[in-house]
Amino acid sequence: MSDIFDEAASFRSYQSKLGRDGRASAATATLTTKIRIFVPATNSPELRWELTLFALDVIRSPSAAESMKIGAAFTLISMYSERPGALIRSLLNDPDIEAVIIDVGSMLNGIPVMERRGDKAQEEMEGLMRILKTARESSKGKTPFVDSRAYGLRITDMSTLVSAVITIEAQIWILIAKAVTAPDTAEESETRRWAKYVQQKRVNPFFALTQQWLTEMRNLLSQSLSVRKFMVEILMEVKKGGSAKGRAVEIISDIGNYVEETGMAGFFATIRFGLETRYPALALNEFQSDLNTIKGLMLLYREIGPRAPYMVLLEESIQTKFAPGGYPLLWSFAMGVATTIDRSMGALNINRGYLEPMYFRLGQKSARHHAGGIDQNMANKLGLNSDQVAELAAAVQETSVGRQDNNMQAREAKFAAGGVLVGGGEQDIDEEEEPIEHSGRQSVTFKREMSMSSLADSVPSSSVSTSGGTRLTNSLLNLRSRLAAKAIKESTAQSSSERNPPNNRPQADSGRKDDQEPKPAQNDLDFVRADV
């Protein structure tokens, strides 16, 4: 009988990798778009700076075609390189585009001068001039920089050029972390990271770009898979070991730490809080299927190779297999553990249709009940004897009493037993925005019987988050309406009873008491409070 269980685990692993072996036998090539990429032909600081300003204007110009904006993005991203053209040729491997790299030797009135002569070249230069004109007109004379003096600056020395290029590229690289998973709520985290680099003196705030330009660039990154592919190739290249890296490469590598595993927070949080905590609840039969699934996914992740952390950015179809909808029970348990022991998980949006409330509460209770558990293998490696282990466990139990303070209760209370997120902010919500696979389990519905008005009034409207808060808000409004109607009805009945003769009042009161004996009702707001 044990063979079939081993085969089931092996089958799960095979199922995760099914269809990935071999090469396509059919013609699967797609149509391509021609992209013109302007790169400097020399290391002249003045030429490179003028070409950088040209690319900035193209991206914000409403008359520029998308292919033209993509080419300008390639120009900006590769400007830090000594030979941008060689960098693009070596790393660009995109079947969707046909890159035409144009070496620029000089600039005229802010646009590249075409080396070839003739009417065709003149028409192209006039078209580029119109793109720059519309960019400036649409911005009402504003420049891409917060400080307009940077736009009119004439850079002739290499040190100033390096500072300017690194600052511009750092702002572009910061955008990619949230460009796919949460572009609409990305400004707060982007501002924090920009402030960090300013504080560390790694960027020059004089070359800070306006929020309007950054929004245009963020939208371009969200829409263009080709630009993201090129940036991922650069990330994988700069992560490799070797000789000393330049300043620009180091800051790109640093930002890459935020980009890795974007959109896969659910998968890695399940491993961290569901498996590595080693709580006894993992022995439940209900978890065995999900454990086999997560084991197969970990093996698949390793087989994908260095591109695995970027599968969401690259829009690879395999990413859907890593969504928590494929292992909902284990994920729900892990989220219960995470929201109890990790303060940073309080901002994570877990309002998903496949959240199982019972296993979520089980995770919360396991984290509290097993606080102070000792890993025997680690204790043996540290050479701890039984007395030291007992003393350590007792110390943790004593300090865990303080975990039941208001801060922890407030953190756990953000998460409803039914899966609705109550309270909390929206920072880093994007990290859970991976594609959703529905598990087929019925979603939890909320009971809305009338209950105590004090509890309804005790929930402030500001505590309801934007995600999943609509049903909760409607429930509270309906509850308060029913309570108000009941209060009016009781007031009317009381006024009527006061007008009755005194000799009839006891009988009427007795009849009313029998007819209106309140029945035990479930608290309407039980789903607002966590099971603490």
Curated annotation (Swiss-Prot):
Residues 491-507 have a biased composition (Polar residues). It is found in: Virion; Host cytoplasm. GO terms for molecular function: disordered domain specific binding; molecular adaptor activity; RNA binding; structural molecule activity. RNA binds at K178, R193, Y258, R352. InterPro entries: Paramyx_ncap. Residues 1-402 are annotated as: Ncore. Keywords: Capsid protein, Helical capsid protein, Host cytoplasm, Ribonucleoprotein, RNA-binding, Viral nucleoprotein, Virion. Disulfide bonds: none annotated. One of its GO terms (cellular component) is host cell cytoplasm. The keyword Glycoprotein does not apply. Residues 403-532 are annotated as: Ntail. Residues 451-471 have a biased composition (Low complexity). It comes from the Viruses. Residues 425-444, 449-471, 487-532 are annotated as: Disordered. Ncore is globular and carries the regions required for self-assembly and RNA-binding. Ntail is an intrinsically disordered monomeric domain in the C-terminus. Belongs to the paramyxoviruses nucleocapsid family. Forms the helical nucleocapsid (NC) in a ratio of 1 N per 6 ribonucleotides, protecting the genome from nucleases. The encapsidated genomic RNA serves as template for transcription and replication; encapsidation by N is coupled to RNA synthesis. Forms the encapsidation complex with the phosphoprotein protein P. Before encapsidation, the newly synthesized free N protein, so-called N0, is chaperoned by P. Homomultimer; forms the nucleocapsid. Binds to the viral genomic RNA. N0 interacts with the phosphoprotein (via N-terminus); this interaction allows P to chaperon N0 to avoid N polymerization before encapsidation. Interacts as N-RNA template with the phosphoprotein (via C-terminus); this interaction positions the polymerase on the template. This is Nucleoprotein. The lineage of its organism: Viruses, Riboviria, Orthornavirae, Negarnaviricota, Haploviricotina. The gene is N.
